[in-house]
A protein has these predicted regions:
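Multi-pass membrane proteins that catalyze or facilitate reactions on polyprenyl-/lipid-phosphate substrates
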Residues: 2-190
Length: 190
């Protein structure tokens, strides 16, 4: 193969990888806002598209691509999330701090399990079959829970109504989301 053909082939491969990255971005952009696992969908799309990249790079890519969604939330809800906002009253600032404390408490169970078992979970569950199974299981669970709760009023309407026991239960369900194919918001909803 001549030098110009190699260069053309390399450019074609690079363009193909760019298109794959755009497709990953579209999948992330859509699934991050729904009660489905965006990480699970990225794993499945990666299995279909088979980007010519190392597993370590794809792991990092899947984390970095989610930063866009995180930044969108921060920008969209900055006033609500910021306890230092000069536009807030003292009471609003206090409520914002209380919200952050409750978020941290709810994160404890998943953080502990994630730190202790991350490598094991990665080896077992970061594969297309377990991801697909979890997506199906949670899809069925959502339908069951939705039908069971139809017409019921929510037990909690405000963050201020959450006590430590309920926060730890939320955190326990967040542990389920350590398994790809399990939505963080979906696990909390169930």
């Amino acid at each position: 193969m001549s030098g110009s053909h190699k260069t053309a082939k390399r450019k074609e491969d690079e363009m193909s990888e760019i298109i794959k990255a755009i497709l990953f971005g579209i999948v992330e952009g859509i699934t991050e806002w729904l009660p489905v696992s965006s990480t699970g969908h990225l794993i499945l799309v990666g299995n279909v598209l088979k980007p010519g990249l190392s597993d370590a790079f794809m792991e990092m890519f899947n984390v970095v691509i989610q930063l866009g969604a995180i930044m969108a939330v921060v920008v969209l809800y900055f006033h609500k999330l910021n306890p230092f906002s000069p536009k807030k009253t003292q009471k609003q600032k206090l409520l914002t701090w209380q919200m952050w404390i409750k978020v941290l408490i709810a994160c404890v169970p998943a953080a502990v399990v994630g730190l202790l078992f991350d490598d094991i979970l990665d080896k077992i569950f970061y594969k297309p079959l377990p991801v697909a199974v979890m997506l199906i299981v949670y899809g069925v669970l959502f339908i069951i829970v939705e039908n069971r709760n139809e017409g019921r009023k929510p037990a909690v309407r405000r963050i201020s109504e959450l006590d430590i026991k309920m926060l730890l239960w939320i955190g326990a369900f967040q542990m389920l989301a350590l398994i790809p194919g399990t939505s963080r918001s979906g696990a909390t909803i169930v």
